[in-house]
Amino acid sequence: MRGLRSVIAVVGAAVCAGALAAPAWALAPSHANITFAAGSTVTETATGVTASAVLVWRQGASDVHGVGCCASDVVDAITGATLVEATPQSSFSFQWASDDARSFRVDSFDARGNYVGSAFTNAPTFVSNVGAPPDADATYAGAWSTQTTASALGGSLHFSTKKGASATFAGNVRTLAWITTVGPTHGSAQIFVDGHQVATVSTHAATVGFRRVKFARAWWGGPNDPVHTIRIVNAGTSGHSRVDVDGFLAVTED
């Protein structure tokens, strides 16, 4: 069974043929991305993994005509089916399997139905390609151990109980997410993104839960994904200092 650094191809930037030209201030092709739902559980299957994904997009200054803002249609770009019509939201949740090709188009309109732009994602599949240990592409510093358990992705995970122990994952990505374990002996971790601390995340819970997405970060950008880094640092929580690394999800451009 393969384990888990999941790599996901996503986010194209081609303009929809035949669409009306969008004003520069409106929703643009690069204004869509896919991230992962914090607190959700990643499921391992016979062919890979399934994760709770979220398509997100920017509405832009879509009410320049002063008629009211805004609504969006979410379209399956492969089948042409409209998945959500005239939603005032700027996100759409779905289950994403590693062998499932996904491609979306988001069309936005003002309150009178005037088209104000489209955004696109192109995600042929995401591929789980990590063997044991399931987070082999991460770099570890400090005291870490490996636990073998059928509940972990790929059958094993890394854990540390020492303050300052860290795990770093880097790549040319559009989105990064950390998968861990929660439980009564688990504590907090400091999250650094591209060298800057952005959050302190608790993995403490009354009962044990495996394969949890506890942090995700997505970036907006053009066609070339830069190198981004996520570093998980054990905060050394008194009385329950364990921090696990079961893997990472990384969205990359097609």
Please tell me what each predicted stretch does.
Residues 2-26:
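Secretory targeting and sorting signals
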Residues 26-75, 79-254:
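Glycan-recognition surfaces in beta-rich domains, encompassing non-catalytic CBMs
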